[in-house]
Design a protein with these regions (language model features):
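Intrinsically disordered, metal-sensing/regulatory segments
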Residues: 1-247
């Protein structure tokens, strides 16, 4: 049992690194100016459906099994924790979109966006590690959900830093900082395994928030039927994976 847990913890750390690399790659697209906007939109759409399905079909039910009805309080707390940072401290920005100088003229805006996204990415890591502490299956489906929005996260923060006149190096460093926050979430959760009954439902609330209020609205702004189909494909992929692999 201990050996199996050690293997799952190692898998969480390894996939946390992969997720962090996704943040860095998103920032690289902005700095290089060869960003595939439509490609990012497809990631957002697929990720929105997939994340919502994982939250409601996997994370929240597992949280209830771990902590009973009290888990729902922590789901709600995770949801509104991100809402607090995004809508109280951070200025308005579009997730996965390029930000221009006239929209982000003050360095406080840059810091606020950075803080909000770091909260996101920290809980990305918490979610990955919490999932693997429960089972390899749960950790894997959560990792996929996290990875699908890593490019847009890195893209967004690097774009904000460039719009604030911080230069390419700082933009890449900001994207790297998001990746580091993800790794920190993985490591802290792996070390504090006794707090799993709180960490998993909190990450469930954050996952629900990111999918429902960050990703889906961006998809709905685009009059593109392909994006709507991809949202449903994201949901369907979780159901198919459950049917084929989840014993």
């Amino acid at each position: 049992m201990e050996q199996e847990l050690a293997i799952r913890t190692s898998m969480a750390a390894g996939l946390g690194l992969v997720a962090a690399a996704g943040n860095l790659l998103g920032g690289y697209f902005v700095v290089r100016k060869d960003w595939p906007r439509q490609f990012l939109q497809y990631f957002l759409a697929l990720g929105a459906g997939y994340m919502l399905a994982v939250a409601f079909l996997e994370i929240i039910p597992e949280s209830l099994a771990l902590a009973g009805r009290n888990a729902l309080f922590y789901v709600l707390a995770g949801f509104f924790l991100v809402h607090l940072f995004e809508h109280t401290l951070a200025p308005h920005f579009h997730f996965g979109e390029e930000t221009h100088a006239e929209e982000m003229s003050h360095h406080r805006a840059q810091s606020s966006v950075m803080l909000g996204l770091i909260i996101h990415t920290f809980f990305d890591g918490v979610a990955i590690a919490s999932g693997f502490l429960v089972s390899t299956w749960l950790g894997t489906v959560i990792f996929i959900a996290v990875f699908l929005h890593k490019l847009p996260e890195g893209f967004t923060v690097a774009s904000v830093f460039l719009a604030c006149g911080r230069g390419r190096k700082k933009a890449i460093q900001a994207a790297a900082a998001l990746g580091a926050a993800t790794l920190l979430g993985v490591l802290l959760t792996s070390v504090l395994q006794s707090q799993l009954r709180y960490a998993l439902p909190l990450s469930g609330g954050v996952t629900t928030y990111v999918a429902a209020t960050d990703l889906l609205p961006e998809v709905n702004r685009e009059p593109n039927w392909r994006l709507a189909v991809l949202v449903f494909l994201g949901v369907a992929s979780v159901l198919i994976m459950q049917h084929l692999f989840h014993v």
